[in-house]
Amino acid sequence: MSVMFDPDTAIYPFPPKPTPLSIDEKAYYREKIKRLLKERNAVMVAHYYTDPEIQQLAEETGGCISDSLEMARFGAKHPASTLLVAGVRFMGETAKILSSEKTILMPTLQAECSLDLGCPVEEFNAFCDAHPDHTVVVYANTSTAVKARADWVVTSSIAVELIDHLDSLGEKIIWAPDKHLGRYVQKQTGADILCWQGACIVHDEFKTQALTRLQEEYPDAAILVHPESPQAIVEMADAVGSTSQLIAAAKTLPHQRLIVATDRGIFYKMQQAVPDKELLEAPTAGEGATCRSCAHCPWMAMNGLQAIAEALEQEGSNHEVHVEERLRERALVPLNRMLDFAATLRG
């Protein structure tokens, strides 16, 4: 695998943490959101990495809690005229690309993703221009402009299958932006891949020494790892997969104790799936006992109850997602290819 670009030195400023709400304030905003969803003919689409109270609200109001692939499917098929996307900005943009006729609202448009930030379109276009004989495959965690340059968009849940398919056709591949997922896919498929060097700030923080110590403390535990994690962490895993695949693995593994190396937001749905099992967070702190993300995306944490209520009530430039039509049409092509390919996998 060749490595052509290294944005590792980028340090992304974290957003301020939302102000904690009292029990009464939470109850007030929950009821307000439920009322506004009905009034607006809106439905919530929430990612597994949002806070538990946000996922619970999506459940209670008939919304969706899922990985980014299922979020895209659900939003496109749901009859609601407005989608409230609780996640990060690329998820809102993806919803708009697939459902241009709908109003797409987000609690904040400032909810970024380090993978998206680490793949600026100008540099990525230059990278692709330098390798015109390669098929361009980009992860869903990218901007509309980067998707518009791609031949395929892919999520972690179908990444191995898609790259294996392209490799069987003899295609050379540009993969962006996650270097760890790219390395994992290359190892699984043997494909010829040029890999962009982005990383998720959460998964990149998992440490082998700390994980080994936790494993020694709980030798009966299985280790579940998202493939956005470093290779050394992936190699320690009993199960590797996307968020939905890790939840499925939690159910099928016989172990009663699970160490989970992904954003701790997943614990809400995973614990529902395995109520009798003990879930442990994989450590992100290094030898200095410090961490930046501490196993929770700071931008996902921006999706608070107050911000959701404000988005439904105020709309406007601070909350509504807009995508340039020219870019939307171009990005729709690789997104639809992904959805069509995923449909063939489901049979």
UniProtKB/Swiss-Prot annotation:
<comment type="pathway">
    <text>Cofactor biosynthesis; NAD(+) biosynthesis; quinolinate from iminoaspartate: step 1/1.</text>
</comment>
<keyword id="KW-0004">4Fe-4S</keyword>
<dbReference type="InterPro" id="IPR003473">
    <property type="entry name" value="NadA"/>
</dbReference>
<keyword id="KW-0662">Pyridine nucleotide biosynthesis</keyword>
<keyword id="KW-0808">Transferase</keyword>
<feature type="binding site">
    <location>
        <position position="200"/>
    </location>
    <ligand>
        <name>[4Fe-4S] cluster</name>
    </ligand>
</feature>
<feature type="binding site">
    <location>
        <begin position="226"/>
        <end position="228"/>
    </location>
    <ligand>
        <name>iminosuccinate</name>
    </ligand>
</feature>
<keyword id="KW-0411">Iron-sulfur</keyword>
<dbReference type="InterPro" id="IPR036094">
    <property type="entry name" value="NadA_sf"/>
</dbReference>
<protein>
    <recommendedName>
        <fullName>Quinolinate synthase</fullName>
        <ecNumber>2.5.1.72</ecNumber>
    </recommendedName>
</protein>
<dbReference type="GO" id="GO:0051539">
    <property type="term" value="F:4 iron, 4 sulfur cluster binding"/>
</dbReference>
<dbReference type="InterPro" id="IPR023513">
    <property type="entry name" value="Quinolinate_synth_A_type1"/>
</dbReference>
<comment type="function">
    <text>Catalyzes the condensation of iminoaspartate with dihydroxyacetone phosphate to form quinolinate.</text>
</comment>
<dbReference type="Pfam" id="PF02445">
    <property type="entry name" value="NadA"/>
</dbReference>
<feature type="binding site">
    <location>
        <position position="47"/>
    </location>
    <ligand>
        <name>iminosuccinate</name>
    </ligand>
</feature>
<feature type="binding site">
    <location>
        <begin position="139"/>
        <end position="141"/>
    </location>
    <ligand>
        <name>iminosuccinate</name>
    </ligand>
</feature>
<keyword id="KW-0963">Cytoplasm</keyword>
<dbReference type="GO" id="GO:0046872">
    <property type="term" value="F:metal ion binding"/>
</dbReference>
<feature type="binding site">
    <location>
        <position position="156"/>
    </location>
    <ligand>
        <name>iminosuccinate</name>
    </ligand>
</feature>
<dbReference type="GO" id="GO:0034628">
    <property type="term" value="P:'de novo' NAD biosynthetic process from L-aspartate"/>
</dbReference>
<feature type="binding site">
    <location>
        <position position="297"/>
    </location>
    <ligand>
        <name>[4Fe-4S] cluster</name>
    </ligand>
</feature>
<feature type="binding site">
    <location>
        <position position="113"/>
    </location>
    <ligand>
        <name>[4Fe-4S] cluster</name>
    </ligand>
</feature>
<comment type="similarity">
    <text>Belongs to the quinolinate synthase family. Type 1 subfamily.</text>
</comment>
<feature type="binding site">
    <location>
        <position position="68"/>
    </location>
    <ligand>
        <name>iminosuccinate</name>
    </ligand>
</feature>
<keyword id="KW-0479">Metal-binding</keyword>
<dbReference type="GO" id="GO:0008987">
    <property type="term" value="F:quinolinate synthetase A activity"/>
</dbReference>
<feature type="binding site">
    <location>
        <position position="243"/>
    </location>
    <ligand>
        <name>iminosuccinate</name>
    </ligand>
</feature>
<keyword id="KW-0408">Iron</keyword>
<dbReference type="GO" id="GO:0005829">
    <property type="term" value="C:cytosol"/>
</dbReference>
